From Swiss-Prot:
Pfam families: IncFII_repA. Keywords: DNA replication, Plasmid, Plasmid copy control. This is Probable replication-associated protein repA1. Disulfide bonds: none annotated.
Length: 281
């Protein structure tokens, strides 16, 4: 008898606040409560508002309602988007990968390769065509690839849990007034909502580039560790020992002693072993 393949890896995704959790503004906390108390996956707006291609604007034919797995993913992603939402700029200050991770939607293959398909398809095939969000892709000429897409929340997103366009506008103006009052205290000039949006966009791009750079460094170190561990253990430890000896003076080596030096060699060997086993993100 054949065992049925799992439809999804995590059938009950849930948004989990990061460990370095900071208290979010009152409006965001209120919006998260409203979204949690409303079934955002089963809303009449989905039946009155047709799916549209975000590039061409053509109406897309919808065959069926959201299946339960995608509905659960949507409920989790809505919470995550609100948590990372910047009120004044309307930007979600997190990448699709970050949203996927905090909602438990990311999966890993047997080879350790990371997949965020479940979250990215929800965003590109449903949330964006429905008009809940809009996404912007920016091409990095230096790296020759796209920077993780910038996500903007649209008024329709908030209408899912009964926050009107007028109320959202009022909250944004209030936030702008607070930002300008802080700038005034510093002796700086006031700014507009458009300038805030531009600054938030630049911050998102900068963070994305830093994250990509750190991923590249880790990958490079991992590949180096893998190649190193292909060597015989005795030879590998001998190589580590020679490198450690170069770091210390004769006086420092005498003070360190043979036992402590051996312990340092073992620690470095097992650190490289652990690094080589890290999943590819």
């Amino acid at each position: 008898m054949f065992k049925r393949k799992k439809y999804v890896d995590n059938p009950y995704p849930k948004f989990v606040q990061p460990k370095n959790h900071k208290k979010r503004p009152a409006f965001i906390r209120y919006a998260m409560r409203c979204a949690a108390q409303t079934d955002v996956a089963r809303n009449e707006l989905y039946y009155t508002n047709p799916l549209k291609n975000p590039i061409t604007g053509c109406v897309l034919h919808r065959k069926r309602r959201l299946n339960e797995h995608r509905a659960r993913a949507l409920r989790a992603v809505v919470q995550a988007m609100l948590y990372y939402f910047n009120i004044a700029s309307m930007l979600v200050m997190a990448s699709v990968e970050k949203l996927s991770d905090v909602c438990g939607l990311s999966t890993y293959s047997s080879a350790g390769n990371k997949s965020i398909t479940r979250a990215s398809r929800l965003i590109t095939q449903f949330m964006e065509p429905m008009g809940l969000i809009s996404c912007e892709k920016i091409w990095d000429k230096i790296l020759g690839m796209y920077i993780p897409k910038i996500i903007y929340l649209k008024p329709l997103f908030f209408m899912l849990f009964d926050i009107s366009k007028i109320r959202l506008k009022r909250v944004r103006i209030k936030q702008l007034e607070w930002i300008n009052s802080q700038l005034k205290k510093k002796g700086e000039y006031p700014i507009t909502l458009l300038e805030i949006e531009k600054q938030a966009k630049e911050k998102h791009i900068h963070s994305a580039l830093l994250f990509r750079k750190s991923k590249y460094i880790i990958k490079k170190q991992k590949n180096k560790a893998k190649k190193f561990l292909e060597l015989d253990e005795k030879y590998a430890k001998s190589y580590i020992l020679n490198n450690l000896v170069k770091k210390y003076s004769t006086k420092e080596l005498c003070k360190l002693g043979l036992t402590k030096l051996k312990r340092k060699v073992n620690c470095e060997y097992f650190r490289l072993k652990k690094l080589a086993q890290l999943p590819v993100v």
